[in-house]
């Protein structure tokens, strides 16, 4: 039990936020119950009133950075439809606050909520660079592109403080090992010195997420992310430095950004992207509840229509977990999205080719000795 102040009246088992007002600067507007936890929790109004009277700060919107110490850092990706074989996540949870993020559910495995906890409690893996180096020195490891990150953005705000992603990139460069990056943060340009060296040997590919050309849409979907203008500038800077960029127009959400596919494709192509990918939004696990709560607070006039159109893409449900279908959807609306994406590729990417990364430069000696390059 946690004792609040000196008054046993305020003893509570645990605390979780249950907001009534709109929380600016956050995607999720509440914490959902953790499906793995035995008890559900609630932050009571009387506790908040107690904090006000006593002059104590409840820190309801403060981000916490919590160190964790995993034994391994390179993860084998078993899903056959996500376009990567291995991932590395320097952080768990993400302060960007993207309301649709599929990684929210993973926070429940750590005992937290997929809602506000996902954005406020960031788990930091400070040992990631050392664990990565140990993996690359392993006798059994065979070169295959490792993606930063398969789950949460490796250039989220925490990276500016901890620098774990940069340290990992230094390891990849040292071992001449191919690496991919997925981000929507302009902080990636901080590491241009390392990225250009990797690019010279065809060891790097950067995926930049661009979900809308509307700042209004961006602000409500992804409240703590870089502006669209800055993301397009990021694509341009990377491309000008001969770093191959794939744009992620994901997720496509019917009724919110589905009408922007052609304009988005043109914008990222003009900025220098060599290709683009897309997914149709699916709201698996706790994300369905979080998204519905969010859309009824932010876009109440469109909420029912958007939710219905998402369901139309997934057989009447907000989620479809079938491999090969879950990220593209089915039905009339999903087909329209696919057709628009196909047209965009033909119109803006027809003569562009995305390079295959080089796995031949990486060769480790047994016993952890590295062949000199």
Predicted regions and their residues:
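A structural motif corresponding to the C-terminal end of an alpha-helix
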Residues: 171-177, 233-245, 313-316, 340-351
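Active-site glycine- and acidic-residue-rich loops that bind
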Residues: 186-189, 253-262
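Conserved Radical SAM active-site core
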Residues: 8-9, 13, 56-92, 96-207, ...
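Auxiliary Fe-S-binding modules of radical SAM enzymes
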Residues: 4, 9-65, 69, 259-373
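Glycine-enriched alpha-helix->loop->beta-strand junction motifs that scaffold or abut catalytic
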Residues: 200-203, 244, 272-274
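Conserved strand-turn element in the central/C-terminal portion of the radical SAM core barrel
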Residues: 213-215, 222-224, 237-257, 281-283, ...
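Short hydrophobic alpha-helical runs that function as membrane-insertion/retention elements
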Residues: 180, 246, 276-278
């Amino acid at each position: 039990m946690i004792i609040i102040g000196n008054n046993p009246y305020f003893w509570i088992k645990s605390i979780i936020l249950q907001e009534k007002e709109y929380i600016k600067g956050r995607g999720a507007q509440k914490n959902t119950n953790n499906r793995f936890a035995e008890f559900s929790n609630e932050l009571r109004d009387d506790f908040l009133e107690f904090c006000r009277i006593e002059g104590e700060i409840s820190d309801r919107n403060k981000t916490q950075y919590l160190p964790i110490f995993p034994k391994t850092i390179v993860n084998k990706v078993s899903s056959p439809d996500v376009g990567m074989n291995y991932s590395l996540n320097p952080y768990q949870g993400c302060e960007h606050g993207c309301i649709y993020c599929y990684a929210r559910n993973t926070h429940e495995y750590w005992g937290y909520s997929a809602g506000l906890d996902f954005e406020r409690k960031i788990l930091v893996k400070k040992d990631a660079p050392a664990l990565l180096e140990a993996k690359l020195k392993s006798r059994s490891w065979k070169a295959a592109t490792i993606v930063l990150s398969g789950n949460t953005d490796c250039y989220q705000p925490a990276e500016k403080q901890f620098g774990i992603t940069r340290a990992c990139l230094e390891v990849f460069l040292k071992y001449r090992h191919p690496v991919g990056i997925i981000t929507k943060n302009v902080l990636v340009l901080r590491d241009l010195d390392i990225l250009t060296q990797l690019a010279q040997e065809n060891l790097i590919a950067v995926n930049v997420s661009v979900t809308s050309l509307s700042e209004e849409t961006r602000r409500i979907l992804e409240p703590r992310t870089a502006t669209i203008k800055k993301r397009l500038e990021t694509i341009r800077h990377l491309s000008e430095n001969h770093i191959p960029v794939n744009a992620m127009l994901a997720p496509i959400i019917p009724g919110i950004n589905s009408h922007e596919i052609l304009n988005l494709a043109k914008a990222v192509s003009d900025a220098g992207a060599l290709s683009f990918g897309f997914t149709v939004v699916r709201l698996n696990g706790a994300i369905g509840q979080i998204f519905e709560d969010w859309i009824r607070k932010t876009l109440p006039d469109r909420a029912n229509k958007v939710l219905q159109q998402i369901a139309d893409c997934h057989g009447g449900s907000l989620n479809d977990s079938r491999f090969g279908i879950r990220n593209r959807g089915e039905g009339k609306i999903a087909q329209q999205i696919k057709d628009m994406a196909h047209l965009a590729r033909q119109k803006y990417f027809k003569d562009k080719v995305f390079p295959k990364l080089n796995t031949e430069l990486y060769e480790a000696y047994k016993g952890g000795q590295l062949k000199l390059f």
